[in-house]
């Protein structure tokens, strides 16, 4: 998170291929320490739970700032939205560790918020080990468990006519080796099955990452669709959302769309035309 917009999650388009194999391939040891620390918005309702000497005075400051900006009525919405994003970020971080063969493990700062040093709202639980209401134990256990199905996809946004290419893996850290079928299915947001199948009797030795097989699924839609790829084995399940859009040719009409200032743009404006200029940072002089 300290990298801000330059971090892997922010700098690259959404995908599920991230791992740390290049990072651990060198001669120096790599330590995974307090990964993530993805913060959420404070739950102002939590203050009434502090009945002892410790008081959540920092939450009073957060409430004052919301009120001053006319946003107090959105406090619960901010908590829910930031919590859903936090869950996706922890899922990305934890799955990256599990996708790294030979990786020794990962460590979070905590599963619950840490109130002992300023505001560290990094947990999926509050300081009282209670749910914040945006993720269930079942949902979190999909990607953080002794057995975790995994799917490597180069991107999560597609056009109709594209092929969804997936490498299916299983991270298995249970007590013993397993030999199990691995099922998969791609469904729409309303539960309609697009395609499904099974990899029969896969060897899943304990303490490692196992490659199960590859998928190639044609994507054909006539309207935007959010779909879910689900992979399951032995009672363990994981899923990832993808988005598929129809290929539509966009007509600009009488509006010129340009990404840089040039003579053609200047001429169009001098003639009274319309221009949508989406200039990249640093391409215009600071005059």
Description of each model-found segment:
Residues 243-261:
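Low-complexity, Pro/Ser/Thr- and charge-rich linker/hinge segments at domain boundaries
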Residues 82, 154-156, 172, 203, ...:
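Outer-membrane beta-barrel proteins
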Residues 261-287:
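A glycine-rich, often tryptophan-bearing local segment used as a flexible ligand/cofactor-contacting loop or short
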Residues 109-173, 182:
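Aromatic-rich peripheral "rim/lid" segments of glycoside hydrolase catalytic domains that contact
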Residues 234-239:
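Short, exposed coil/turn segments at beta-strand boundaries within extracellular/luminal domains
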Residues 1-125:
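Substrate-binding/catalytic cleft of secreted carbohydrate-active enzymes
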Residues 161-201, 210-218, 224-233:
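Beta-strand-rich binding/interaction modules
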């Amino acid at each position: 998170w300290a990298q801000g917009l330059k971090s892997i999650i922010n700098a690259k388009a959404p995908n599920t291929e991230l791992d740390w194999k290049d990072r651990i391939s060198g001669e120096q040891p790599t330590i995974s320490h307090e990964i993530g620390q993805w913060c959420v918005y404070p739950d102002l309702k939590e203050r009434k739970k502090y009945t002892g000497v410790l008081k959540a005075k920092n939450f009073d400051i957060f409430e004052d700032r919301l009120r001053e900006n006319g946003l107090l009525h959105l406090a619960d919405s901010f908590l829910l939205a930031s919590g859903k994003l936090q869950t996706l970020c922890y899922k990305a971080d934890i799955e990256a560790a599990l996708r790294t063969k030979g990786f020794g493990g990962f460590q979070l700062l905590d599963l619950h918020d840490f109130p002992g040093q300023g505001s560290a709202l990094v947990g999926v639980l509050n300081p009282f080990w209670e749910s914040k209401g945006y993720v269930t134990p079942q949902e979190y256990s999909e990607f953080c468990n002794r057995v975790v199905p995994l799917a490597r996809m180069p991107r999560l946004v597609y056009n109709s006519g594209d092929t969804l290419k997936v490498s299916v893996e299983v991270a298995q850290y249970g007590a013993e080796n397993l030999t199990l079928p691995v099922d998969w299915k791609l469904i729409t947001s309303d539960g309609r099955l697009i395609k499904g199948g099974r990899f029969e009797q896969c060897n899943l030795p304990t303490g490692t990452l196992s490659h199960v097989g590859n998928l190639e699924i044609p994507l054909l839609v006539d309207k935007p669709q959010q779909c879910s790829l689900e992979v399951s084995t032995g009672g363990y399940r994981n899923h990832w959302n993808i988005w598929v859009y129809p290929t539509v040719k966009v007509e600009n009409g009488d509006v010129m769309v340009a990404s840089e200032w040039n003579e053609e743009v200047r001429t169009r404006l001098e003639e009274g035309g319309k221009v949508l200029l989406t200039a990249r940072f640093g391409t215009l002089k600071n005059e």
